[in-house]
Structures are given as C-alpha cells and as structure tokens.
C-alpha cells in the first residue's frame, strides 16, 4: 500500500529528478479483454517508440511488462539513467484517448493512446497526484470477542494497522481513576 512515507519518498526522489525521465502509466487490468495476452506491453512499446525513448530504458520497462505478473489495475513506471521505479496501483486512471484534458492532452514529449500515457522529459507526476487526491483513506474497525482490529483502505488496497490501540493494564485504570481530581467528592470527602 502506498503510505505517507512512500508518497514523501516519491516526491523527493522522482519529483526533484533532473534530466529526461520516462513517466509511463499503463492500464494492466487483467479483467479487461483488450489486455489479454499482455497487449498492454505492445501499446507501451509503441508509446515509447513514438517518444524516441532510449532503447535500454524501453527494454527495462518491457522486460517488466512482459515477464512479471503485475497484480494491479494500473502500473506506473519512472525510468531514467539512475532511476527505475514501478508502482502498482489497484485503481484505474483515466487513460483513454477520449479524455483530452489539459494535463492528458498530447504535447511535445507526451503520448496518449487508450490504456497508455507516456511522457519523456521532466517527471510527469500529475496522474499519480490525481489518484492520490481522488481516492480517500478509509478506516475500518473490526471488533470481536477477543480484540479490536483497525484496517486502512486506500487506493483499492487494505492493510491492518498494528499499533492503532494503546494497551493499558487494568490496574493502571484503577490508579488513574483514583488519582482523578474529583475523587474526594465521589469517595465521601477527605
């Protein structure tokens, strides 16, 4: 799950990167018929070829797309000289050709086709920022006879929060309640 630390790391590592970086957003949802047989790899290859991305970067990205099972709906790649990041997202981004907004429109160094958005140049984080902004974090509290559990849901993923509750000894409760400022009125005076 993408947590606050991961978001901070992405912002510092990728956002401040100098030089040309490939920012590639690929719809890899296996439930879609248009992605059968890893067709998304061909669309990504065409996008990188259209942007004239260096061959070594293209090969690294294609190796992941063709040889690894990406358990995600959208795969986000950031690739540069000394940078290679893959972020699997469990949500779908609007990566369709009919969505021609100001930030998804084809410009110099940007290529958009159904299911693939590629950008060659400075890191293009706007679709990722959109996903982080569009989807809210939710908390789920599960209570049974023995314990309480808290789960965090964000971007289609669920993760248990292990340190959500402070464990107190019941003897500490007694001491805390006896030391309360209003105890003299409850216990019959001094």
Question: What does each model-found stretch correspond to?
Answer:
Residues 134-159:
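Gly/Thr-rich phosphate-binding beta-strand-loop-beta motif of the actin/hexokinase/Hsp70
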Residues 88-92, 152-155, 163:
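Short acidic, glycine/serine/threonine-rich loops at helix termini
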Residues 38-40, 77, 91-93, 144, ...:
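Generic preference for flexible, low-structure residues
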Residues 100, 106-121, 157-190:
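Long, charge-dense
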Residues 29-31, 83-84, 147-148, 156-158, ...:
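Conserved nucleotide-binding/hydrolysis micro-motifs of P-loop NTPases
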Residues 1-131:
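Non-catalytic, solvent-exposed interaction/assembly segments
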Residues 127-134, 160, 175:
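Generic structural "secondary-structure junction" signal
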């Amino acid at each position: 799950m993408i947590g606050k630390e991961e978001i901070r790391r992405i912002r510092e590592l990728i956002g401040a990167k100098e030089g040309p970086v490939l920012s590639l957003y690929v719809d890899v949802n296996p439930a879609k018929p248009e992605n059968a047989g890893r067709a998304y790899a061909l669309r990504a290859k065409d996008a990188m070829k259209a942007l004239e991305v260096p061959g070594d970067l293209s090969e690294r990205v294609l190796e992941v797309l063709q040889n690894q099972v990406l358990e995600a709906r959208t795969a986000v790649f950031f690739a540069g000289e000394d940078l290679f990041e893959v972020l699997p997202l469990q949500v779908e981004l609007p990566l369709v050709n009919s969505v021609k907004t100001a930030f998804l429109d084809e410009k110099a160094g940007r290529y958009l086709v159904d299911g693939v958005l590629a950008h060659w140049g400075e890191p293009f984080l706007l679709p990722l920022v959109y996903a982080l902004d569009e989807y809210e974090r939710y908390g789920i509290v599960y209570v049974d006879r023995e314990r309480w559990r808290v789960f965090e849901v964000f971007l289609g993923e669920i993760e248990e929060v292990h340190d959500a509750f402070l464990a107190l000894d019941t003897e500490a409760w007694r001491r805390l309640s006896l030391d309360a400022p209003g105890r003299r009125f409850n216990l019959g005076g001094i």
